[in-house]
Each structure stands twice: as structure tokens, then as C-alpha cells.
UniProtKB/Swiss-Prot annotation:
Name of this chain's protein: Amine oxidase [copper-containing] alpha 2, peroxisomal
Residues reported to bind substrate: 320-331, 407-412
Catalytic residues (positions): 322, 410
Alphabetized UniProt keyword annotations: Copper, Disulfide bond, Manganese, Metal-binding, Oxidoreductase, Peroxisome, TPQ
Disulfide bonds: 341-367
Protein's gene: CuAOalpha2
Reaction(s) catalysed (UniProt annotation): a primary methyl amine + O2 + H2O = an aldehyde + H2O2 + NH4(+)
Organism: Arabidopsis thaliana (Mouse-ear cress)
GO process terms (BP): intracellular arginine homeostasis; nitric oxide biosynthetic process; primary root development; putrescine catabolic process; response to abscisic acid; response to auxin; response to jasmonic acid; response to putrescine
């Protein structure tokens, strides 16, 4: 009888936590509830009429960052019996063509701060105004005439929005470009672009202010672009066996509101319309000290820079700052149980206001689950003891918090993985659909140009070269807020002639503690060094400073020249690692106003002050980079490409923190079969 082994892991039932159901007093980092968002709208509506006939729109609404000292005082108090910090909302709105910043206090139910933004750049685009802009284009007569002139069916045309960037203009208006695509037998929208049109929409006036048609070559065909399993035809494959996920005692983690407790970890997870998934107040329990110790005060996506490498008119402006322009929370999607997240996952909803301030919910926008991947936590076989052979192995398990944000054609998987050993892994997965351009070629032998700026991935279709730079903001509090950044260089030494050895060389370490921000800017790969955030006021019993080490993934750095306009706006990618002193206003690496920004309010600009960072409350910024030269395997959808980094305890514990972890049982069961099978 043929048998299939199904691995039993964990599960009781899928359950969902709705952020609108929590009862005050909330955790200081809880996302704004539906009730609070309605209150924000009502309070603002008393001062600024809101509605279809008024030019007042909500571009961003989120929790106004409470004072860190108050949060830590509340968090460290026994049973959280200290009054939590004042709860406030931060609002960016458009008001008659201006960007207005408003702070609302919930205890007084009043506006406590109100000012007009006077610098460069615009706030995040809303979904509503992007949809309105594309609707305007689809009714614009010159556009419709161009579509008909091409012999295309207007009803099969889809128009998408694209930011315009900045290319040296002294003043910029709130314009976007729109890009048309043709369906006509395909639902893979982004693989059939209609090129040769420049269509500019003024968002404040909601009208087309620029249109030009330069009719260009053939359109990619619709065939070969299907990706829905229900529409694909046999043969199917490769064949994968099913797995059963079962946990009779329920999941190993507990969720109290937005606070997650699992194994030796405790942390808070929430949702922000710009950042998406936010992890706060992550602490790990130290068995030797019998208490929780701080690791991460707050960590989240800060920005994603995605420049494309075609300098021609249809492409040069595509240099997205995804979080700042489109909102990585606003574009987050509902996760599919059993596929986006395994059956042992718990889910949380996300709530944010629409353009008119009305709350909108994304169901199942975040998930959390225990991950059993067959990895080994630690092991050792001892065969040198006479008469004994000892083998000790511990299977590994970790806890993963995940979200997916779909920004146009790309789906980004963002996850934080907590390990019992004390490590936190931050991961970024890239999948979705290529952004392509039509060409007359179907084979490389036909190419006439010096550069097609990409790869032929299908008939008449080039996948355009591009980059992804994903920047995380990590406010590390390693066993407290007084931290330093240590760069330990691995230096090759010649063996002294005075040493009686055949060895000619060895390496040793040279420790450098960064004094100011300039000392802490790191381009990975230039030299062998270890990067550690330490607490110089806390030491192990052997005298080592407690710390957490950065373990980078494969590093990529920008290849654009530094005076290129997209790179000026994204100068925060010039280094893989930055360290800055904590400043609650320095949250977004591209600046608070990223759309059409000019690079004058970015992480790179803040860091030019070269502030002191030794033995201070410091923040680490880390950029995960990808250079993407498309290939045929990326068509019609892309297998996930994964990158990331790890924060790993280094002299944080007195010994291996999982030494005494007991093995857990994993088992398999045979497949039930009939006699005739």
C-alpha cells in the first residue's frame, strides 16, 4: 500500500482579531480604532467642512507618536498601573490646495496643533483620488480618440496612476501621470501596456493638464499571460504533496489585544496606513535574570525605492517611493488563509480612513503563526567519550508576523521572524508581475538598438531592468536606551617571527565605537567587519558589553549617479546602514512629504548634522537591496525572490539561551487508503 506521510504541526482553528473591537484604555501603540477615526472626522468637520463639494481630503491619519519616555515608564510599571501617555491622532490633509498637519487629542476631543506645510513635496496619494484621476482620463476625448485610432476597444482599456517624481523643477504641482493598459482577453493588466502616451492629471483640480500621443510599436499579445489556476490547462505541475497542520492544544502564542506573547518573546504589533505592519516593544525573557529585557522599541518599513532603468519618455519618471507615495499599508491586501499564511495562523484587521475620513477596513491584513521548517535549533554529536556516542538535537521553531502589500504590479511580502535563540529576522519577498514594455522583437537576434534596457521575456515583450531598495527603521533599545554602535574590523596580521609556528598569518579584531553619525554610515562589502549595537552600561559576568549584531543579507547598492534626480530623492540608499540619534519626527527615510519631493528632507540630509551617537538612544536604518535583471522565468508571474537580514544577540545572554529548550514532538501519519487503491 502506497503511503504519503503528512507532517502534523499545529492547529485548532483560524481566528481573527478585529482592531475595532478593543476597549479602552488602549495600549499606547494600538492603532486608531474605527470609533477614534470617526471622532477624528467629526472633530475636524467642525472646523473644515468635509464632503464632495469641499476641497478638504484626508491623506494620512495615524497614531501621533507618544513621548517615548512616557511609553517606557508605562511599559516598565508593574501590571501597567501607570496612566498611559495621552492618545492623539496625527492627520495630514489637503485643504484648498495646501497640505495641513493637524494633531487631535482624544481626551479633550479637540485640535491641539494645526499648521500648514510650507516645504517641498506632497502627502501620500489616496486610493480615492487615484481612482478619480483615472476615471477622468477615460472620459478625456483626446485620449479616447487615440485609443480608437489604434483600433482598440475603449471598454477593454484600464488606466493606472503613476507618480511623476522630480527632475529639477523649482516648483512642482500635485500632478501624476497615468498609464493605459489593454485587457482584451487577459486579466494580467500590467503585461499589455499601451505605450506612446503622456497623460498628466492635476489632482487638486482633478483634470487632465497635459496630453501627448507618440504612437509607438506593437502591443504584446494576450496569450501566455494567464496565471489563474482555474483557467490554466493541463498538464499541471510540479506535483506537491499535501501537509496536515494540527495542534491539539492550540497555538503556542497568545494574543491580548495587539500584544503577542510566545515562548520567550513579548511584543506589540499594529497597522499603519503608510508603513503597514509595525512591531513595537519587543522584549525577550532571560531565564538567568528572571525578567524580560528590551530589544526593539519600534521597527517598521520606512520606504521602498523602485527606480526603472529605461531613460526614454515613457519610462524615465518611474522611480517610485512606494511607502511615501502610495502607502504600504494603504496598498496592503487581505491575506488568504492556508496559502498566504498557514492553517495555524491568527489574523488581524487593519483600519484606516478613506479620503473623506470614513473608516475603511482591510480584513486579515496581518497574520502571525508558528513556523516549523525542518530547521535545526542546535545539535551536537559527541563520539570521543569512550564507550559512548551522544547526540543532542533541538528542532527549531519560530514565530512569524507577516503582511503583503501589492503596489501596482509588485506584491511585497514583509515579515518579522522571532526565534527562541533571541534573533529577529526581517524579510522581504518580491513577487507579482513584471512591468514590461512592448517591442517589435520576439528573439534576441532581431534586436537593432544598442540597449533595450531589459530582457525579452515573451513575444514583443521586454521586462525592464530595475531596482528595489527596501529601508527599515529600527529603534533598537538593547537592554535599555543608552546604546552605542560598534564596528569591529577583522584585520589580517602577519605572524611575528618571534612566534614559533609554521603559520604565516592570522586575523584579529579592531574595535571602533562610532562617535557621530558620520562614523556609522556603512557600505556593506567594502571590508570585513562585524556591526553590533551594544549597551555600554550593561555587561555580562565576563565583562562583555551586551549587544545585538547585524547579520546582513546579500548587499546591493544603488548604481545611479548621485546627482541623478531619483537618487537625490532616495539618497537614504547611498549607504546600507545608517545610525541616527532617536528623534520621533525622523520616521520616514524619504521625508514626511515624499510625492514630488526634492530630496531636502531625507535621512541623508538629517544625518549631515553629524550628531553624537555614542551612549545615546539610537536608531538603525537598514536597506535591503535588489538589482533585478528580468528573465523568462519571471513571466507571466514571478517566483518569489527573498532577501533580508538578522538581528542576533551577541554577549546579550550569559550562555546559549535555548540550551535547556526541550525537544517537541513531530510525527507523521500514513495516508488512509482503500483496498482497491
Amino acid at each position: 500500500m502506497a503511503q504519503v506521510h503528512l507532517t502534523i504541526f499545529i492547529f485548532s482553528s483560524i481566528f481573527v482579531i478585529s482592531s475595532s473591537s478593543f476597549i479602552p484604555p488602549p495600549h499606547p501603540f494600538d492603532p486608531l480604532t474605527e470609533t477614534e477615526l470617526k471622532l477624528v472626522r467629526n472633530i475636524i468637520n467642525k472646523s473644515y467642512p468635509i464632503g464632495h463639494n469641499h476641497k478638504f481630503t484626508f491623506q494620512y491619519v495615524g497614531l501621533n507618536e507618544p513621548e517615548k519616555s512616557l511609553v517606557l515608564s508605562w511599559h516598565s510599571s508593574p501590571d501597567r498601573n501607570v496612566k498611559p501617555p495621552p492618545r492623539q491622532a496625527f492627520v495630514i490633509a489637503r485643504d484648498k490646495g495646501m497640505s495641513r498637519e493637524i494633531v487631535i487629542d482624544f481626551s479633550t476631543r479637540a485640535i491641539v496643533s494645526n499648521k500648514i506645510h510650507v516645504g517641498n513635496g506632497n502627502p501620500m496619494l489616496t486610493i480615492d483620488e487615484q481612482q478619480a484621476a483615472t476615471a477622468v482620463v477615460q472620459k478625456y476625448k483626446p485620449f479616447c480618440d487615440s485609443i480608437i485610432k489604434r483600433g482598440l476597444n475603449l471598454s477593454e482599456v484600464v488606466v493606472t496612476s503613476s507618480t511623476m517624481g522630480w527632475f529639477g523643477e523649482t516648483k512642482t504641482k500635485r500632478f501624476i501621470r497615468t498609464i493605459p493598459f489593454y485587457l482584451n482577453g487577459s486579466v494580467n493588466t500590467y503585461l499589455r501596456p499601451i505605450e506612446g502616451m503622456t497623460i498628466i492629471v492635476n489632482l487638486d483640480q482633478m483634470k487632465v493638464t497635459g496630453f501627448k500621443d507618440r504612437f509607438t510599436g506593437p502591443m504584446p499579445k494576450a496569450n501566455g499571460r494567464e496565471y489563474r489556476i482555474s483557467k490554466l490547462k493541463p498538464p499541471f505541475g510540479p506535483s506537491l504533496r499535501s501537509a496536515v497542520v494540527f495542534q491539539p492544544d492550540g497555538p503556542g502564542f497568545k494574543i491580548d489585544g495587539h500584544v503577542v506573547r510566545w515562548a520567550n518573546w513579548e511584543f506589540h504589533m499594529s497597522f499603519d496606513v503608510r508603513a503597514g505592519l509595525v512591531i513595537s516593544l519587543a522584549s525577550i525573557f532571560d531565564m538567568d535574570m528572571n525578567r524580560y529585557r528590551q530589544v526593539l522599541y519600534k521597527g517598521h518599513l520606512s520606504e521602498m525605492f523602485v527606480p526603472y532603468m529605461d531613460p526614454n519618455d515613457d519610462w524615465y519618471f518611474i522611480s517610485y517611493l512606494d511607502c511615501g507615495e502610495f502607502g504600504c499599508g494603504q496598498t496592503a491586501v487581505s491575506l488568504e488563509p492556508y496559502t498566504d499564511c498557514p492553517p495555524n495562523a491568527a489574523f488581524m484587521d487593519g483600519i484606516f480612513p478613506g479620503q473623506d475620513g470614513t473608516p475603511t477596513k482591510i480584513s486579515n491584513v496581518m497574520c502571525i503563526f508558528e513556523k516549523y521548517a525542518g530547521d535545526i535549533m542546535w545539535r551536537h554529536t559527541e563520539a570521543e567519550v569512550p564507550g559512548l556516542k551522544i547526540t543532542e538535537v533541538r528542532p527549531d521553531v519560530s514565530l512569524v508576523a507577516r503582511m503583503v502589500t501589492t503596489v501596482g504590479n509588485y506584491d511585497y511580502i514583509i515579515e518579522y521572524e522571532f526565534k527562541p535563540s533571541g534573533s529577529i529576522k526581517m524579510g522581504v519577498g518580491l513577487t507579482g508581475v513584471l512591468e514590461v514594455k512592448p517591442v517589435e522583437y520576439v528573439h534576441t537576434s532581431e534586436i537593432k538598438e544598442d540597449d533595450i534596457y531589459g530582457t525579452i521575456v515573451a513575444d514583443n515583450t521586454v521586462g525592464v531592468n530595475h531596482d528595489h531598495f527596501v529601508t527599515f527603521r529600527l529603534d533598537l533599545d538593547i537592554d535599555g536606551t543608552e546604546n552605542s554602535f560598534v564596528r569591529t574590523e577583522l584585520v589580517t596580521k602577519r605572524t611575528p617571527k618571534s612566534v614559533n609556528t609554521p603559520r604565516k598569518s592570522y586575523w584579529t579584531t579592531k574595535r571602533n565605537t562610532a562617535k557621530t553619525e558620520a562614523d556609522a554610515r556603512v557600505k556593506l562589502g567594502l571590508r570585513a567587519e562585524e556591526l553590533v549595537v551594544v549597551n555600554p552600561t550593561k555587561k555580562t559576568k565576563h565583562g562583555n558589553e551586551v549587544g545585538y549584531r547585524l547579520l546582513p543579507g546579500p548587499a546591493s547598492s544603488p548604481l545611479l549617479v548621485q546627482d541623478d534626480y531619483p537618487q537625490i530623492r532616495a539618497a537614504f540608499t547611498n549607504y546600507n546602514v545608517w545610525i541616527t540619534p532617536y528623534n520621533k519626527s525622523e520616521v520616514w527615510a524619504s521625508g514626511l512629504y515624499a510625492d514630488r519631493s526634492q530630496g531636502d528632507d531625507t535621512l541623508a540630509v538629517w544625518s549631515q548634522r553629524d550628531r553624537e551617537i555614542e551612549n545615546k538612544d539610537i536608531v538603525m536604518w537598514y536597506t535591503v537591496g535588489f538589482h533585478h535583471v528580468p528573465c523568462q522565468e519571471d513571466f507571466p508571474t514571478m517566483p518569489t525572490m527573498f532577501g533580508g537580514f538578522e538581528l542576533r544577540p551577541t554577549n546579550f545572554f550569559e550562555q546559549n539561551p535555548v540550551l535547556k529548550a526541550k525537544p517537541f514532538n513531530l510525527t507523521t501519519i500514513p495516508k488512509c487508503t482503500t483496498k482497491n487503491e
